[in-house]
């Protein structure tokens, strides 16, 4: 088996380079180095870690355009999307620096239960050790910083495994981390072969795994990890609900931004649209009108809104889901056009609620519309999926918003916004097969730490 792999630009298949997998012996050496680095990390003060993360934020800002260009070349996402990603990565680094200074324990009196004994408990948060951070292709730098930042802030060491498609951007990111002051025995980059993944996940020197990606890979990680702490951010089948009192102009803009941006390749994309019957035709017509004007093409051009999906295989999967929906009775309001790895923005009507495109995660620029009469009608349809990440609703009725908040199986409901809403200091994560644990810098620090108690 070859120890190298080649990468191409999804837009035009131009070569991006040839890279080497990390041999198993090197992985073991990296883990030994990181285990040794835990000792020095424990002696590094929180304000020192915060200083490193602030320096990293400054470097990310300085190299933002260079990194955004790499992201676009690697993933096919538009340069506009990549620039937004770099802004988010900068924010995540700043937030990690701020939260590094806020890791605080508590003291507890023991007299709440008899016999009290006059003791006091001092509870502190301690790092887990070495965190294996695994990131997907679609937000290679932003998600990496959402893992590396809080892991480092908490005092852990990090083995960073990016998606293979993102090798060049990951190499630049690690270089910037070193330049910011992270020692090499605190952060290592690896690109293991597929055959080595299970034993890497099971390795005794990996103390926890922080993974963002698909459910199948997460199942393999869980099976190999044993009793390791897991933070899993997985897929979503996120609904956007438009009530008859919702702002249609804002709702159509949100639908487009939360579905067709990044060519629909985001776990929090608006993958299913539920439109109240009283405004269905008006919403559909406005949505089709706006979507038909989106520029599809070269992702390096500033006016391009939709680039290619990550590869031809991904495009074929989306096409299959669309064709199955049409076979199930759906009609095409817009799109259903394909060119290489391009899937043109597609809007489907009359979609069966049991069609695969409504039940499974569709990772591409396709938007199924469902007309409904009442909230009670759609709650079981929305919940009829293995996922439960986020949701969005457009309504002026607080009672409706609260009912959806209580009844939907999701981690977040965004009122008068799309399901893709996320900011660095909010908790992020879902229920069911959308994952385990919560990201968001403060919450991720807790996930990658444990409590240690001194009784005196």
UniProtKB/Swiss-Prot annotation:
Q: Describe the pH profile of activity.
A: Optimum pH is 9.0.
InterPro entries from the UniProt entry = Ald_DH/histidinol_DH (IPR016161), Ald_DH_C (IPR016163), Ald_DH_CS_CYS (IPR016160), Ald_DH_CS_GLU (IPR029510), Ald_DH_N (IPR016162), Aldehyde_DH_dom (IPR015590), ALDH-related_metabolic_enz (IPR051020), Put_phosphonoacetaldehyde_DH (IPR017656)
Q: Which of this chain's residues are annotated to bind NAD(+)?
A: 213-218
Active-site residues, as the UniProt record annotates them: 233, 267
Query: EC top class, in one word?
Result: oxidoreductase
Keywords, alphabetical = NAD, Oxidoreductase
Q: Provide the reaction this enzyme catalyses.
A: sulfoacetaldehyde + NAD(+) + H2O = sulfoacetate + NADH + 2 H(+)
Function, as annotated, reads: Mediates conversion of 2-sulfoacetaldehyde into sulfoacetate. The enzyme is specific for NAD; NADP is not a substrate. Part of a pathway that can utilize the amino group of taurine as a sole source of nitrogen for growth.
Spell out the subunit comment.
Homotetramer.
What is the protein name for this chain? Sulfoacetaldehyde dehydrogenase
Q: Which organism is it from?
A: Neptuniibacter caesariensis
